Amino acid sequence: PLYSSAASDVYKRQIDGRIGFIGGMNIADRYVRGTQWGTWRDTHFRIEGSGAAGLQASFLSDWSATTKTHISGPEYYPPVGHFTDDILQIAPSGPFGKWRALLQADSYAIARARQRIWIQTPYYLPSEVLNTALQEAALAGIDVHLMLPARSDSKVVDLATHSYLDDMMKAGVKISFYKPGFLHSKLLIIDDMLSVIGSANMDFRSFEHNFEINAFVYDREFASRMAAIFEDDLTHCHTVTPGEWFTRPRTRRVAESLMRVFSPLL
């Protein structure tokens, strides 16, 4: 079909069931050549050990659902070595069933934050629950920082995304726009302990309609490394002030409000 409401945006790769890759990267020329307006910035990780088995299980589950062919056996789940003591959860999510695993997990993590919530996402079209949770965290004095591309691959999505930022900024959320190109990274850092990396954007489609997969890593050293990546990207950003944001043209704000209506479909 030309369009499906149950799209698959799962960016995971498997090698012999022993090594897995997870993050936002597609297999595409744009990662080498960039875009007309700059580089394509993404975050992707290699996983070895039991975490790779989790990716393998998710892949085989998707394969079974797609082809109606069940694949199992020890050859698909080879013995894996022990590499670190990091606690890692592989969390797939899809449009079937009552619960939305990634939305619930992110909302729970945000509600438990005490120091910082740092987010990188190419699109910000959140559910009301998630949007409110981030604003409440900022109002409680938590360092909430949202990093977005200055320009994404969709002008309509940019307009809809910006319609959510007024209330975020009023609540004290810091908003930075990545300037060198398209920021496609999907990263969530909670305090100095939890990092979330994967395929899911902060938007309706990822949480409600798409097949997605994220890795939840519970480790201080790893969180520190992710924070360093965030801070390095921040040197290539423009952090917007309220004075700048609230003086943008009225016609622009009207267009943003109109596009917001279509957020669940974008």
Q: What does each model-identified segment do?
A:
Residues 154-202:
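C-terminal structural cap/anchor segments
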Residues 12, 18-20, 116, 143-145, ...:
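Beta-sheet entry/capping signal
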Residues 9-90, 94, 190, 196-266:
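Signature of lipid phosphatidyltransferase scaffolds
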Residues 94-104, 125-129, 156-157, 178-181:
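A general structural motif
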Residues 1-7, 11:
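Single conserved hydrophobic/aromatic residue that forms the stacking wall/gate
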Residues 99-102, 133, 172, 184:
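Extended alpha-helical targeting/anchoring segments
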Residues 93, 119-121, 148, 178, ...:
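Thr-Gly-centered strand-to-loop micro-motif
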Residues 108-174:
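Primarily the HKD phosphodiesterase
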